[in-house]
Amino acid sequence: MKAVSRINNVTRNGVQKSTKCGIVVNAKAFDMLARQYSDPIKAILQELGANAADSHIRAGKQDVPFSVKLPNSLDPHLRIRDYGVGMTEDVVYDVYINYMKSDKTDTNSETGCFGIGSKTPLAYADQFNITTYNDGTMTMYALVKSEDGVPELNEFGSWNTEEDNGVEISFSVKEDDFDKFSDRAVQVYKYFNTRPEVTGNGSFAYPERKDIISGDTWRISKGSYSDNTVVVMGNVAYPVDIWQFEYDSKERGFLNNNAVIEVPIGDLNVTPSRESLEYTDHTIKGISKAIS
Protein backbone atom coordinates (compact mmCIF):
# COMPACT_ATOMS: atom_id res chain seq x y z
CA MET A 1 0.00 0.00 0.00
CA LYS A 2 1.35 3.39 -0.95
CA ALA A 3 1.99 5.63 2.00
CA VAL A 4 0.16 8.96 1.90
CA SER A 5 2.65 11.81 1.64
CA ARG A 6 2.68 14.25 4.52
CA ILE A 7 4.12 17.73 4.59
CA ASN A 8 6.06 18.66 7.72
CA ASN A 9 5.78 22.34 8.58
CA VAL A 10 9.01 23.27 10.35
CA THR A 11 10.45 26.65 11.35
CA ARG A 12 14.27 26.70 11.43
CA ASN A 13 15.04 30.33 12.21
CA GLY A 14 18.24 30.70 14.21
CA VAL A 15 19.22 27.02 14.20
CA GLN A 16 22.94 26.60 14.95
CA LYS A 17 23.16 22.82 15.17
CA SER A 18 20.94 19.97 14.02
CA THR A 19 21.22 16.26 14.88
CA LYS A 20 19.01 13.44 13.63
CA CYS A 21 17.27 11.25 16.20
CA GLY A 22 17.71 7.48 16.17
CA ILE A 23 16.25 4.33 17.68
CA VAL A 24 18.28 2.11 19.99
CA VAL A 25 18.18 -1.54 18.94
CA ASN A 26 17.39 -3.31 22.20
CA ALA A 27 14.83 -5.61 23.83
CA LYS A 28 12.64 -2.70 24.89
CA ALA A 29 12.20 -1.49 21.31
CA PHE A 30 11.24 -4.91 19.96
CA ASP A 31 8.96 -5.61 22.92
CA MET A 32 7.09 -2.37 22.25
CA LEU A 33 6.60 -3.40 18.63
CA ALA A 34 5.36 -6.84 19.63
CA ARG A 35 2.99 -5.50 22.30
CA GLN A 36 1.29 -2.80 20.21
CA TYR A 37 -1.73 -5.01 19.48
CA SER A 38 -4.83 -4.86 21.69
CA ASP A 39 -5.92 -8.26 20.30
CA PRO A 40 -2.73 -10.18 19.40
CA ILE A 41 -4.52 -13.32 18.16
CA LYS A 42 -6.71 -11.36 15.77
CA ALA A 43 -3.74 -9.28 14.61
CA ILE A 44 -1.69 -12.40 13.85
CA LEU A 45 -4.44 -14.02 11.78
CA GLN A 46 -5.11 -10.75 10.00
CA GLU A 47 -1.50 -9.86 9.17
CA LEU A 48 -0.42 -13.34 8.13
CA GLY A 49 -3.60 -13.75 6.11
CA ALA A 50 -3.07 -10.42 4.35
CA ASN A 51 0.51 -11.41 3.51
CA ALA A 52 -0.69 -14.74 2.12
CA ALA A 53 -3.29 -12.97 -0.02
CA ASP A 54 -0.67 -10.48 -1.23
CA SER A 55 1.59 -13.35 -2.29
CA HIS A 56 -1.26 -14.89 -4.27
CA ILE A 57 -1.87 -11.54 -5.98
CA ARG A 58 1.79 -11.39 -7.03
CA ALA A 59 1.56 -14.93 -8.39
CA GLY A 60 -1.64 -14.18 -10.31
CA LYS A 61 -3.57 -16.56 -8.03
CA GLN A 62 -5.85 -14.06 -6.30
CA ASP A 63 -8.81 -16.44 -6.76
CA VAL A 64 -6.95 -19.37 -5.16
CA PRO A 65 -7.51 -19.71 -1.38
CA PHE A 66 -4.57 -20.04 0.97
CA SER A 67 -4.74 -22.60 3.79
CA VAL A 68 -5.25 -22.12 7.52
CA LYS A 69 -4.90 -25.08 9.91
CA LEU A 70 -6.27 -24.14 13.31
CA PRO A 71 -4.66 -25.53 16.48
CA ASN A 72 -6.25 -28.57 18.11
CA SER A 73 -5.39 -31.34 20.59
CA LEU A 74 -3.76 -33.51 17.89
CA ASP A 75 -1.64 -30.68 16.50
CA PRO A 76 -1.51 -27.56 18.69
CA HIS A 77 0.08 -25.45 15.95
CA LEU A 78 -1.46 -22.68 13.90
CA ARG A 79 -0.34 -23.15 10.30
CA ILE A 80 -0.92 -20.63 7.54
CA ARG A 81 0.26 -21.75 4.10
CA ASP A 82 0.10 -19.73 0.91
CA TYR A 83 0.72 -20.91 -2.65
CA GLY A 84 2.10 -17.68 -4.02
CA VAL A 85 5.52 -16.63 -5.24
CA GLY A 86 7.58 -18.20 -2.46
CA MET A 87 10.70 -16.62 -0.97
CA THR A 88 14.36 -16.86 -1.86
CA GLU A 89 16.92 -16.88 0.96
CA ASP A 90 17.73 -13.22 0.33
CA VAL A 91 14.06 -12.25 0.55
CA VAL A 92 13.57 -14.21 3.79
CA TYR A 93 16.45 -12.42 5.49
CA ASP A 94 15.36 -9.05 4.13
CA VAL A 95 11.78 -9.49 5.35
CA TYR A 96 12.32 -11.06 8.76
CA ILE A 97 15.41 -9.34 10.15
CA ASN A 98 14.39 -5.84 9.08
CA TYR A 99 11.60 -3.98 10.82
CA MET A 100 9.93 -0.99 9.11
CA LYS A 101 11.08 -2.18 5.68
CA SER A 102 8.53 -3.18 3.05
CA ASP A 103 8.61 -3.81 -0.68
CA LYS A 104 4.90 -2.99 -0.95
CA THR A 105 5.01 0.79 -0.48
CA ASP A 106 5.01 1.54 -4.22
CA THR A 107 1.77 -0.26 -5.09
CA ASN A 108 -1.88 -0.17 -4.09
CA SER A 109 -2.49 -3.70 -5.34
CA GLU A 110 -1.20 -5.19 -2.07
CA THR A 111 -2.10 -4.55 1.58
CA GLY A 112 1.27 -4.40 3.36
CA CYS A 113 3.42 -1.31 3.82
CA PHE A 114 4.70 -0.97 7.40
CA GLY A 115 7.24 -3.81 7.47
CA ILE A 116 6.07 -5.22 10.82
CA GLY A 117 3.13 -7.52 10.03
CA SER A 118 5.29 -10.52 9.15
CA LYS A 119 6.64 -10.51 12.71
CA THR A 120 3.23 -10.46 14.47
CA PRO A 121 3.53 -14.06 15.81
CA LEU A 122 6.07 -12.68 18.31
CA ALA A 123 3.13 -10.86 19.91
CA TYR A 124 1.95 -14.30 21.10
CA ALA A 125 4.85 -16.75 20.92
CA ASP A 126 8.57 -16.59 21.71
CA GLN A 127 9.34 -18.12 18.33
CA PHE A 128 7.65 -19.11 15.10
CA ASN A 129 8.61 -21.26 12.14
CA ILE A 130 8.99 -20.14 8.54
CA THR A 131 9.05 -22.81 5.83
CA THR A 132 9.64 -21.64 2.29
CA TYR A 133 8.95 -23.57 -0.89
CA ASN A 134 10.78 -22.05 -3.81
CA ASP A 135 11.36 -23.70 -7.20
CA GLY A 136 11.82 -27.22 -5.84
CA THR A 137 13.64 -26.31 -2.63
CA MET A 138 12.18 -26.30 0.88
CA THR A 139 14.04 -24.29 3.52
CA MET A 140 13.21 -24.08 7.22
CA TYR A 141 13.80 -21.07 9.47
CA ALA A 142 12.66 -19.83 12.87
CA LEU A 143 12.39 -16.27 14.13
CA VAL A 144 13.04 -16.39 17.88
CA LYS A 145 13.32 -14.00 20.79
CA SER A 146 16.96 -14.43 21.75
CA GLU A 147 18.33 -14.41 25.29
CA ASP A 148 18.80 -10.64 25.21
CA GLY A 149 15.26 -10.06 23.92
CA VAL A 150 16.28 -9.05 20.39
CA PRO A 151 14.73 -11.29 17.70
CA GLU A 152 17.08 -13.38 15.58
CA LEU A 153 16.54 -15.53 12.51
CA ASN A 154 17.78 -19.13 12.63
CA GLU A 155 18.19 -21.23 9.48
CA PHE A 156 18.00 -25.04 9.71
CA GLY A 157 18.69 -26.24 6.18
CA SER A 158 17.25 -26.95 2.75
CA TRP A 159 15.82 -30.04 1.07
CA ASN A 160 14.39 -30.97 -2.30
CA THR A 161 10.61 -30.82 -2.54
CA GLU A 162 7.78 -31.26 -5.01
CA GLU A 163 5.52 -28.88 -3.08
CA ASP A 164 4.09 -25.83 -4.82
CA ASN A 165 5.86 -22.51 -4.28
CA GLY A 166 4.78 -20.57 -1.23
CA VAL A 167 5.39 -20.03 2.48
CA GLU A 168 4.08 -21.68 5.65
CA ILE A 169 4.12 -19.88 9.00
CA SER A 170 3.52 -21.96 12.12
CA PHE A 171 3.79 -21.78 15.90
CA SER A 172 2.50 -23.60 18.95
CA VAL A 173 -0.72 -22.41 20.61
CA LYS A 174 -1.80 -22.89 24.23
CA GLU A 175 -4.77 -25.24 24.63
CA ASP A 176 -6.81 -22.56 26.39
CA ASP A 177 -6.55 -20.42 23.25
CA PHE A 178 -7.72 -22.97 20.65
CA ASP A 179 -11.27 -21.56 20.58
CA LYS A 180 -10.00 -17.98 20.52
CA PHE A 181 -8.03 -18.66 17.34
CA SER A 182 -11.09 -20.24 15.74
CA ASP A 183 -13.37 -17.35 16.74
CA ARG A 184 -10.92 -14.71 15.54
CA ALA A 185 -10.42 -16.57 12.25
CA VAL A 186 -14.14 -16.19 11.54
CA GLN A 187 -14.03 -12.49 12.43
CA VAL A 188 -11.04 -11.83 10.19
CA TYR A 189 -11.45 -14.07 7.16
CA LYS A 190 -15.18 -13.59 6.51
CA TYR A 191 -14.26 -10.25 4.92
CA PHE A 192 -11.54 -11.61 2.59
CA ASN A 193 -12.30 -11.47 -1.14
CA THR A 194 -11.04 -15.06 -1.41
CA ARG A 195 -11.62 -16.77 1.90
CA PRO A 196 -8.98 -19.26 3.03
CA GLU A 197 -9.67 -22.96 3.39
CA VAL A 198 -9.78 -23.51 7.14
CA THR A 199 -9.20 -26.92 8.74
CA GLY A 200 -8.43 -28.22 12.22
CA ASN A 201 -11.76 -27.35 13.83
CA GLY A 202 -14.82 -29.28 12.68
CA SER A 203 -17.21 -26.62 13.98
CA PHE A 204 -15.56 -23.76 12.08
CA ALA A 205 -17.98 -22.07 9.69
CA TYR A 206 -18.34 -18.68 8.06
CA PRO A 207 -21.62 -16.89 8.85
CA GLU A 208 -24.22 -16.68 6.12
CA ARG A 209 -24.54 -13.19 4.70
CA LYS A 210 -27.99 -11.89 3.82
CA ASP A 211 -27.92 -8.36 2.45
CA ILE A 212 -30.91 -6.14 3.16
CA ILE A 213 -29.77 -3.35 0.87
CA SER A 214 -26.55 -2.59 -0.99
CA GLY A 215 -24.83 -0.08 -3.22
CA ASP A 216 -21.76 -0.26 -5.44
CA THR A 217 -19.36 0.08 -2.52
CA TRP A 218 -21.43 -0.81 0.55
CA ARG A 219 -23.98 -3.22 1.95
CA ILE A 220 -26.13 -3.62 5.02
CA SER A 221 -26.68 -7.22 6.06
CA LYS A 222 -29.37 -8.89 8.14
CA GLY A 223 -28.54 -10.21 11.59
CA SER A 224 -25.15 -10.02 13.28
CA TYR A 225 -22.90 -10.56 10.23
CA SER A 226 -21.26 -7.29 11.21
CA ASP A 227 -21.73 -6.05 14.78
CA ASN A 228 -20.66 -2.54 13.84
CA THR A 229 -19.91 -0.56 10.71
CA VAL A 230 -16.59 -1.52 9.14
CA VAL A 231 -14.57 -0.39 6.17
CA VAL A 232 -12.87 -3.19 4.25
CA MET A 233 -9.65 -2.17 2.52
CA GLY A 234 -7.32 -4.81 1.10
CA ASN A 235 -9.20 -7.68 2.83
CA VAL A 236 -8.79 -6.03 6.25
CA ALA A 237 -11.92 -4.81 8.07
CA TYR A 238 -11.48 -1.64 10.12
CA PRO A 239 -14.18 -0.57 12.61
CA VAL A 240 -15.51 2.92 11.94
CA ASP A 241 -15.75 5.40 14.80
CA ILE A 242 -18.95 7.28 13.97
CA TRP A 243 -18.04 10.00 16.47
CA GLN A 244 -15.45 11.24 13.98
CA PHE A 245 -18.32 12.53 11.83
CA GLU A 246 -20.62 15.50 12.50
CA TYR A 247 -23.67 14.50 14.55
CA ASP A 248 -26.24 15.68 12.00
CA SER A 249 -24.26 14.69 8.89
CA LYS A 250 -25.57 12.22 6.32
CA GLU A 251 -22.44 10.13 6.89
CA ARG A 252 -23.22 9.80 10.59
CA GLY A 253 -26.76 8.69 9.85
CA PHE A 254 -25.60 6.04 7.38
CA LEU A 255 -22.80 4.73 9.58
CA ASN A 256 -25.27 3.93 12.36
CA ASN A 257 -26.58 1.02 10.26
CA ASN A 258 -23.81 -1.57 10.86
CA ALA A 259 -22.77 -1.37 7.23
CA VAL A 260 -19.86 -2.98 5.41
CA ILE A 261 -18.11 -0.44 3.19
CA GLU A 262 -15.47 -1.38 0.63
CA VAL A 263 -12.77 1.03 -0.53
CA PRO A 264 -9.70 0.62 -2.76
CA ILE A 265 -6.33 0.10 -1.09
CA GLY A 266 -4.77 3.44 -0.26
CA ASP A 267 -8.03 5.40 0.11
CA LEU A 268 -7.71 5.55 3.91
CA ASN A 269 -4.97 6.04 6.49
CA VAL A 270 -4.53 3.25 9.02
CA THR A 271 -2.54 2.91 12.23
CA PRO A 272 0.67 0.80 12.13
CA SER A 273 -1.02 -1.99 14.11
CA ARG A 274 -3.69 -2.08 11.39
CA GLU A 275 -6.31 -2.45 14.12
CA SER A 276 -7.93 0.91 13.47
CA LEU A 277 -8.22 3.82 11.08
CA GLU A 278 -6.31 7.06 11.42
CA TYR A 279 -8.91 9.78 11.10
CA THR A 280 -7.07 12.24 8.89
CA ASP A 281 -8.84 14.42 6.32
CA HIS A 282 -7.79 11.81 3.76
CA THR A 283 -9.63 9.07 5.67
CA ILE A 284 -12.79 11.12 6.32
CA LYS A 285 -12.99 12.05 2.63
CA GLY A 286 -12.40 8.44 1.58
CA ILE A 287 -15.27 7.12 3.71
CA SER A 288 -17.58 9.95 2.65
CA LYS A 289 -16.84 9.24 -1.01
CA ALA A 290 -17.56 5.52 -0.61
CA ILE A 291 -21.03 6.05 0.84
CA SER A 292 -22.08 9.10 -1.18
Q: Which residue stretches match the model-derived regions?
A:
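Conserved structured core elements
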Residues: 6-9, 38-47, 74, 86-93, ...
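Conserved phosphate-chemistry cores used by DNA topoisomerases
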Residues: 31-32, 36-42, 46-50, 67, ...
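Conserved catalytic-core segments centered on acid/base and nucleophilic motifs
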Residues: 45, 52-56, 77-85, 110-124, ...
